[in-house]
């Protein structure tokens, strides 16, 4: 299986989800001055910001990470978290990233996710990597 890369704010909701998921993952640092490079194809797991609108939905740290062409070239899919209180815009960072980078929006979950979300993501990530051509 290939990589998961995620960002979690100081609320740690996405981090707790990733810990429960139990799959190898790299965290995009909270400190915007810290940089990471990913050398293999990955699925990005990202929270949605901005109170339900598209503007500001993607965290700045994630934008900076994806502005690095090396990292951007390796994204293969996106999973988003959010808050259902934002109606149709919940998890909208996934939609923004999927459209901008031409990758599939694989799943969305609320806040820290449920056990059902954990099971669905584990299964979905495994199936996704099995179906993706090796050269991707």
UniProtKB/Swiss-Prot annotation:
It holds the Pfam family Flavodoxin_NdrI. InterPro entries: Flavoprotein-like_sf, RNR_Ib_NrdI_bac, RNR_NrdI. GO terms for molecular function: FMN binding. Gene3D superfamilies: 3.40.50.360. GO terms for biological process: protein modification process. Probably involved in ribonucleotide reductase function. Belongs to the NrdI family. HAMAP family: NrdI. This is Protein NrdI.
């Amino acid at each position: 299986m290939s990589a998961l890369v995620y960002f979690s704010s100081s609320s740690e909701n996405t981090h707790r989800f990733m810990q429960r998921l139990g799959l190898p993952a790299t965290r995009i640092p909270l400190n915007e001055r810290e940089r990471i490079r990913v050398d293999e194809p990955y699925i990005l797991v990202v929270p949605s910001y901005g109170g339900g609108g598209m503007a500001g939905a993607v965290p700045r740290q994630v934008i900076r990470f994806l502005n690095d062409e090396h990292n951007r070239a390796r994204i293969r899919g996106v999973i988003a978290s959010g808050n259902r209180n934002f109606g149709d815009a919940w998890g909208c960072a996934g939609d923004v990233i999927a459209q901008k980078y031409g990758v599939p929006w694989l799943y969305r979950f609320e806040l820290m996710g449920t056990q059902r979300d954990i099971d669905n993501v584990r299964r979905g990530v495994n199936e996704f990597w099995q179906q993706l051509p090796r050269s991707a």
